[in-house]
A protein has these predicted regions:
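Alpha/beta catalytic cores of group-transfer enzymes, especially the acyltransferase/condensing modules
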Residues: 32-34, 60-62, 72, 121-217
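A broad detector of short, well-ordered amphipathic alpha-helices
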Residues: 54-55, 88-92, 115, 128, ...
Length: 219
């Protein structure tokens, strides 16, 4: 698949369709860690986007406009903020590109919390229901994750079997397999620090911008 639109909308993609001529349109909504301070600032000049973001903010009863434009990294790392912010961002940016984009899409999918945006896009439930759901989901997960200091780290490269063995030996959990050559390790902050001190050979480690290890046994 190749990205279309702008690089700031990484969840819009198109590529050759198998079995027939022409392109297919896939909309893939991202999960936590995709948010950055000010990442929605440039979009606010688009009235379609700003109106939709304000509406979704009101539904969720969270100031997503501020969080998407001026809030700092620590604030938007909070799961209770990040999850509704990313769902609203996915919906509002897509509508800004094309108000009818979801009805034209051949494929709708989401990574982690992005599945809620994809569900709303597919019509499985309304955008309002999506925002209420993700607000409650984010709050519940934030509360559960706060009981122990945990986090996640992306492990890129290395031998797959060696990486998984090293993750297990460190007492960590392989929370996500994000594609060939990338596994996300989840666990306590202390476990991840020890893992980073002695990483598997030929790997690069990238701590994720998340409030905790939001998966499996850690919440």
């Amino acid at each position: 698949m190749t990205t279309v639109g702008t690089s700031s909308v990484p969840w819009l993609a198109s590529g050759p369709s198998r079995g027939h001529s022409g392109d297919v349109l896939a909309i893939v909504a991202p999960g936590q860690g995709a948010q950055k301070p000010g990442f929605l600032s440039d979009w606010m000049s688009d009235p379609t986007f700003s109106d939709h973001l304000a509406w979704l903010s009101a539904v969720a009863d969270i100031d997503l406009v501020t969080h998407g434009t001026t809030s700092d990294e620590t604030t938007i790392k909070d799961t209770a903020v990040a999850q509704p912010l990313l769902v609203a961002a996915a919906l509002a940016t897509a509508w800004s590109v094309d108000p009818e984009i979801f009805s034209r899409a051949d494929l709708l999918a989401g990574h982690s919390v992005g599945e809620i945006a994809a569900g709303a896009a597919a019509g499985a439930f309304s955008a309002e229901a999506a925002m209420v759901l993700v607000r409650e989901r984010g709050r519940a997960m934030a509360e559960a994750a706060s009981r122990t200091a945990t986090s996640m780290t992306a492990v890129i490269g290395g031998d797959a079997d060696e990486v998984l063995a090293a993750i297990e030996a460190a007492g960590l959990t392989p929370a996500n397999h994000n594609g060939k050559g990338q596994v996300v390790a989840a666990g306590t902050v202390e476990q991840l620090e020890a893992f980073a001190a002695k990483p598997p050979s030929r790997t690069r480690l990238f701590p994720l911008s998340v409030a905790g290890a939001l998966s499996l046994i850690h919440i």
